Amino acid sequence: MKESDFMPVSNTLGRAFEYALCQKIDSKFDNITLTDRAVAEQSKDKRYYDALNSDEKSKYDISTNRICSEWLNLKLISSNMYTLDRLPDSAGVNGDVTDIRLEAPNAIVNISLKHNHNALKHPRLTRVPKWIDINTDSKYASDYKNIWDSFLSKANTLSSTATLFNELIAIEANFVFDNLYNPLCKLVSNYLTENIKTSSQVESLFKFMVGKYDFYKIIDNPDCVLIQDFIDLKMPKNVKIEQTDKSYIKMTFNNGVILNLRLHTASSRISTKSVKFDVRGSFDDIDSITIKKN
């Protein structure tokens, strides 16, 4: 949930939800103390909650109240004293998907929050080698740059005045898919297939995409709250990676997990050269509970 002067609506709602849940936890449980970092994040994100209308605030109150009373109170040990921390976006770069961490000397509850979506994460393409424990790869970096250079050259030929991706799409519907998404997906798919040589690399890729540490994913949907248990997941030893469409990559792990990565622009402006994957997963052995709001 990254802060920006031009933060998308989905991000502001996500920050407001994280703020609301932390406030509810703090008020409901006497054995929890916020860390200095959490206090600072709460202070920053209060404005997003305050910007909600009364109906939205009421919905958040219902969701957070149900999470605390019907789930979290069963996970916390009443005799423990916990700290509540809010983790920065930088943790996700290294595979920790935790947004809220409740920690005691002998217990820990990691929570990943999602508001009206179930994406696992949104990784950028510049760090692909690091996904499989390769610190740097000059050839990958060069190939990535060449794809962008070629795309920008073709875009300038198509329209020398276009500054937005949508302007290119308006002229030629499949232009971005054919000249940017497809070659980038091919690059990533081929690179991972050719460079994953050990089971430890498969495990690193899995942990990066799904989560490095045990956690619970809480998805706040309009009619219910879905809580998924990502505790003690079996680690995979093998993975099959394939490009399934111009903007899609599929990862099939031998522990029953299938990940689908959809490539899309992270900014509307061509000059930012910013793209990222939206990662969704299918899991065979994930326990989950659904808490109805009505």
Question: Where on the chain are the PLM-derived regions?
Answer:
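Short, positively charged
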Residues: 1-98, 103-294
